[in-house]
Amino acid sequence: MQRYLRLILTIMAAIPAGSGAQTPPPAIEGPVYVATYVEVVPTAADEGAALLKQYRDASRKDAGNQRMELVQELGRPSRFAVLAIWQDQKAFELHANKALREKLKPIQAAPFDDRVHSGLAVAAKDALRRSAVVVLTHVDVPPPFKDTTISLLQQLSEASRKEAGNQRFEVQQQASRPNHFTVVELWADKKAYDAHVMAGHTRQFRDKLGPMSGALYDERLYQPLE
């Protein structure tokens, strides 16, 4: 109980007095990484997948697009994520998905959840393979723990890329809330992913992150959609 009380007091101390007004996040320097979470009603999973595939294929032709991938959550096929990289802020802002949102509105179970990031610990962008296990994790810590968490995530990414079966391991930092991160992992198969979970550096990371976490460690598994 005392640990959580100290955590709450630390968060409160980090909030400036009179900080009710929010300022827009600064423009991202370099590539813009976007993770968009989409959820449709369970009975419309196939329709949602078809619309999202059309959107993905069309967006790949847009100027400045460097990645446009579509994945479907394992065990919950009505939930999807779109993973994109745009060359720069201008290319991202010129890209529009209003038409997609209008088409999905009749079947959506929740509003789109867009997470816009800069690349924090990114390496080669391996192509998404059909057999891959895709893992998306949202890491949230209070602002005073941001820098410590960045160091932990960088260490984790470096160690994880050396594991057998790893095809991608990147950390993205949210532009509007720099104490929030998205971790994108690609593993050759479930066996490789399970080995990663059991690895010493992974468990050490979770042990150190736990006391600093501002929310549940949100890790979800997906399959690629062609």
Report each predicted region and the residues it spans:
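N-terminal secretory signal peptides that target proteins for export/translocation
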Residues: 1-4
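Short helix C-cap/helix-to-loop transition motifs enriched in small/turn-promoting residues
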Residues: 61-64, 89-92, 101-105, 110-113
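Bacterial N-terminal signal peptides
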Residues: 6-17
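Glycine-rich beta-strand-turn "strand-cap" elements at beta-sheet edges
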Residues: 22-30, 69-78, 102-134, 138, ...
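Short amphipathic alpha-helical segments
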Residues: 42-65, 100-104, 145-168, 201-205
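Sec/Tat-exported extracytoplasmic proteins
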Residues: 55-63, 96, 108-111, 164, ...
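Short, well-ordered beta-strand segments in beta-rich or mixed alpha/beta enzyme
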Residues: 31-38, 69-96, 132-140, 170-197
